[in-house]
Amino acid sequence: SNIIKKILIFHQDMFYYKFNFILPNTKWVGTKACKFKNFKNPQWLRNVKDRKYKFYRLDTLFSETKYQSIEVKKNGGWHFTNIKTAEDIKHKLHSYLHHNEFEKSSLDIEDIQDIISNQKTIYNLKADKRVYKIGEGEKLEKIEVSHLPNYIKNNELKYKKWIQE
């Protein structure tokens, strides 16, 4: 009820493979929220652009994806992706929307394990969408468990497989 803007976008730290492998200088902006009265459908919310537009941008008055009434939560939480084994990541990428790109890469489980061991992302999020981006991406950094959500900190033994020493 204290949400004033039409759309909320959460800037979240991005983590790969292990709970404490962070992708520095990159924020996940895929987590969005709105009041139920403004909600159209899930795809509409996914398509909303992650930036505020100036009041004089007339195209925002007619756009389904560009809005002036956006609030960005700068410290919006954590986004964990591919917290999986190399085998499970391969299965996920074969099932993924862009599986053709993954299949062209000819990465096998050992290659994926090497990418994880070398603390790199499996694809380059900043690559031009028209070019090949699967393979070794950006370098991940290990952070201390103290920076993670309380639930993970309080259950560190339970999740030790997913926390890099």
Model-derived segments and spans:
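Conserved catalytic core of nucleotide-sugar-dependent glycosyltransferases
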Residues: 2-107, 113
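C-terminal accessory extensions appended to soluble enzyme cores
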Residues: 65, 69-165
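Nucleotidyltransferase catalytic core that binds NTPs
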Residues: 1-2, 144
